[in-house]
Design a protein with these regions (language model features):
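N-terminal secretory signal peptides
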Residues: 1-27
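N-terminal export signals
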Residues: 30-49
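Non-catalytic accessory segments flanking enzyme active sites
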Residues: 76-155
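Proline/glycine-enriched tight loop/beta-turn segments at coil->beta junctions
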Residues: 147-148, 157-165
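Cap/lid segment of the alpha/beta-hydrolase catalytic domain
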Residues: 168-256, 313-315
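Mobile cap/lid helix-loop segments that gate and shape the active-site cleft of serine hydrolases
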Residues: 238, 242-246, 260-261, 298-339, ...
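Alpha/beta-hydrolase fold nucleophile elbow
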Residues: 271-280
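C-terminal catalytic histidine-bearing segment of alpha/beta-hydrolase fold enzymes
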Residues: 367-368, 373-408
């Protein structure tokens, strides 16, 4: 098909047809406008065909070792010789338990350790709301001196004593609001949205109470400069960076908040502190995995869209600084860390179209975790579900798994 201009006309032809398909009679002004638009379009087509400038080596890559300028390839080469000194090797339960003690001690050191003395909780209820299927209480407590946690307690109706309880930890985004049914305007919503799909409410729908906490550097736990940007901007860069400067980590800080949340659960008569689980997605999955390692009061855990290898996720794809533990690859891979939860029940779910925690590495990592569980004689206590979806909460098998193992 061709377009041509005649005197006062626009002619559209098709080579397969004997004559013009269309002839439009136009004023000179219309033709001038159309000609200008056509010229602009031609420039855009030429620009689209022109390779985008990527740096000073454009046009010289055939003259240099191009791979030598790629930092990710460089780190992958370093990974090949990573020590992984405490990666799992045991073949019997006795050796496996000793391995757990050794690796837990090392990872605790890498995280920056945990406070030996816990300050009083000084908890305070801020608000109570009633909904058709549950009751929602907003509360705060002191985690560390000068560091406070906001949370929501969701208890199912009708009210009963000693509810099995899930600690729910969200990932990057708007913070805890996004898992308890609160929209970006602070209003209640009835449709489960976002990539986390209000999974704290879903836990309640499966018969458990949910204690959803605001992770440090998200939501209301951000500095004033970050809050001024938008609801989804995290304060991880200044806060997690500061942790590293102090020889600590954001993961360690968030894990300690989970420990303190369970301290708070123990003060509530309607919650059964002997039936506590922990679940989280993405960065909340990170927190859940590490918290389950160090907090024995967590009886079952669900890690959504996190379990992978360090190599194929945070070492290969751009991720937030809050994910990193200095020196951990000298000692272990991610599957080793997850194996420290054994033999307590662990459920893992992974999206087949997750671009930041690639599915093949998730599957391979889980197989390594399962082998650790098998050495403990607990192979049936860990499961993975892969689903046809992106980086998002699924819960189809995971929530029933948690309810079953917490005797709901």
């Amino acid at each position: 098909m061709t377009i041509s201009f005649g005197l006062g006309t626009l002619i559209i032809k098709d080579a397969r047809a004997p004559g013009p398909l269309y002839t439009y009679y136009m004023t000179r002004r219309d033709l001038a406008k159309l000609a200008g638009a056509t010229a602009l379009l031609q420039k855009q087509v030429v620009a689209a065909d022109t390779p985008k400038y990527t740096g000073a080596l454009d046009g010289f890559m055939d003259k240099v070792n191009g791979a030598g300028f790629d930092p990710v390839l460089f780190t992958h080469k370093l990974y090949e010789s990573a020590a992984l000194r405490l990666s799992f090797q045991a073949t019997n339960r006795k050796d496996a338990e000793q391995w757990q003690r050794n690796l837990k001690a090392k990872i605790s050191e890498l995280l920056g350790g945990f406070p030996l003395k816990r300050p009083p909780l000084l908890s305070q209820t801020l608000e109570v709301r009633e909904f058709p299927g549950y009751r929602r209480e907003k509360f705060v407590f002191q985690s560390r001196t000068d560091s406070w946690v906001l949370g929501y307690l969701l208890t199912p109706k009708p009210a009963r004593a000693l509810n099995a309880t899930m600690v729910c930890v969200t990932g990057h985004g708007r913070g805890v609001d996004d898992i308890v049914g609160i929209d970006e305007k602070g209003q209640d919503r009835t449709v489960k949205e976002g990539y986390a799909y209000d999974f704290a409410i879903q836990a309640v729908e499966h018969g458990m109470a949910a204690v959803a906490i605001e992770p440090m550097a998200f939501g209301c736990r951000r500095d004033a400069i970050t809050k001024a940007h938008n609801l989804t901007a995290s304060a991880c860069q200044p806060a997690a960076g500061a942790a590293l400067l102090l020889g600590q980590t954001m993961i360690g800080w968030r894990v300690y908040d989970v420990m303190r949340t369970i301290d708070w659960i123990e003060t509530r008569p309607e919650l059964d502190a002997h039936r506590v689980g922990c679940m989280g997605i993405s960065g909340g999955g990170t927190c859940t995995m590490f918290a389950a390692v160090f907090e024995p009061r967590i009886r079952a855990a669900m890690v959504s869209c996190y379990l992978n290898t360090f190599r194929d996720s945070i070492m290969s794809v751009s991720h937030c600084i809050d994910n990193y533990v200095p020196g951990i690859l000298n000692w272990a891979e991610m599957y080793d860390v997850a194996g420290l939860i054994a033999p307590r029940p662990l459920f893992v779910e992974s999206g087949e179209r997750d671009t930041i925690f690639p599915i093949e590495a998730s599957r391979a990592s889980f197989e390594r975790v399962k082998k650790i569980y098998e050495v403990f004689g607990a192979g049936a206590l860990t499961e993975q579900e892969t689903f046809d979806g992106p980086h998002s909460f699924w819960g189809k098998r995971g929530l029933p798994f948690l309810a079953r193992h917490l005797a709901v």
